[in-house]
Amino acid sequence: MSALDTSIRVEVKTEYIEQQSSPEDEKYLFSYTITIINLGEQAAKLETRHWIITDANGNTSEVQGAGVVGETPTIAPNTAYQYTSGTVLDTPLGIMHGTYGMVSESGEHFQATIRPFRLTTPGLLH
């Protein structure tokens, strides 16, 4: 792990979108707001994303692609980039985690870790 691997901090806030969910059809919509903070000394460009999404039944799906929400932002030192996206699960509980493929101002490629976070409907867990 290089110093660049730890120069990016990822914070996550989740929300269950009840009005667009359909529990009777086993469809639970969640939004997640991601804040990517550059704690390093160089600007870093987010080039790719890789998500691993697991529902309460153990079903796993992967999402890979360029950028996030149609953008490949460059995050200057001591600044943050924020976006909101969403996912649909077949269960009222799930977990997401993954990585962002980043490239530093000096051209070094590195991975920013997105630690596991829970997606859950209100009141399901105490």
Curated annotation (Swiss-Prot):
Domain ApaG: 2-126
Pfam families: DUF525
Domain of life: Bacteria
InterPro entries (alphabetical): ApaG_domain (IPR007474), ApaG_sf (IPR036767), Uncharacterised_ApaG (IPR023065)
GO biological process, one term: error-free translesion synthesis
PANTHER family assigned to the protein according to its UniProt record, in alphabetical order: F-BOX ONLY PROTEIN 3, POLYMERASE DELTA-INTERACTING PROTEIN 2
UniProt-recorded name of the protein: Protein ApaG
Organism the protein comes from: Shewanella baltica (strain OS195)
